[in-house]
Amino acid sequence: LKNDDAKGALYELVEEADIFIQNFRPGTAERLDVDYDTLTDHNEDLIYLAISAFGQTGPWRERSGYDLLIQGMSGIMSVTGEADRQPVKVGLPMTDLITAMWAAFGATTALYRRERTGEGEYIDLGMLEATLPWLTKQAGMVFAGEETKRMGTKDPVLAPYQTFETKDGFINICILNEKLWGELCEALDRPDLPEDDRFEQNADRVEHLDELEAEIEATLADKTTDEWIEVIAEDAGVPAGPVYSVEEALNSPQIEARGTVTEIEHPELGEVPVIEHPLKFRNAESGFELPPPLLGEHNREVFRERGYSEAEIDRLAELGVFGDDAEDGDTDD
């Protein structure tokens, strides 16, 4: 984008575009002449989405940011991990994914609004602000004047709602009300637990979490995870499940039955396993029609659609408009 020919080509693409997304630090788009005001000179109905670590305003606006930083600065790490250990990062790029979902939601909402009003839109999305709404329970505690802290897999307001150790592994048990608590105790053959003053009501159990955990794990140690799943989840109908590895999750019978993992044909890698689109529409097709494109695979196709000749596309490629490492696309058709 420091090349005038590249900018000219981009402006022509923008003329027919619905949505333009950039994730530069604030100020960079202006320096490159791809800011909202510049691009809307070429398409006044454009939906422009600017993603950054901390948004376009505020004292941190010019800072760079990545998932680890945002997990720390959003408070996620302060409530993740065991109480007596250091803060822990969630084991996936959570804030990247959260921000991407907000971006998709914002862009499609703006597109729908444009269909009704004819107006384009400028959307300012910061990773930190995108993440905070997901801390619903913890934010509510802060607003109520309560302290948030790391609790491992325990829940600050529900008990038992955590991971327990079994004879050969781990099991998650989720008790949301007194009915389920009674059914769990019956499944565990522990009628004494509901009669114990420490465990009678949810508030009592939250107050005595450590003692509750010790009592339940003493019983769970007698059987394997699979055995307890049958007793607790299948027979008693109490919410409970195993702690799978990623491989076990991808190969579970439920995922197999839903056709969630499938294969696509990649032009260089052959058959490649992928996780399918999770939204299963009744009246519309969803899922993968094509494999992910190679870098620059559709350059020529896109510029042909804009009326460029092969000679003009060749010239852009020679000038480096498509990038040093990108293919310039198929020249056979």
Regions found by a protein language model. Give the residues of each.
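A structured beta-alpha segment of the ubiquitous adenosine-cofactor-binding alpha/beta core
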Residues: 1-41, 221
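Beta-strand segments within the central parallel beta-sheet cores of soluble alpha/beta enzyme folds
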Residues: 12, 120-128, 197, 231, ...
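Active-site-adjacent "lid/gating" segments in soluble enzymes
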Residues: 30-171, 175-176
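Aromatic-enriched alpha-helical interface/lid elements that frame and gate functional surfaces
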Residues: 159-236, 240, 253
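A glycine-rich dinucleotide-binding beta-alpha-beta segment and adjacent secondary-structure elements
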Residues: 234-289
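Flexible, small-/acidic-enriched active-site or ligand-binding loops
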Residues: 269-315
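Amphipathic terminal alpha-helices
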Residues: 311-333
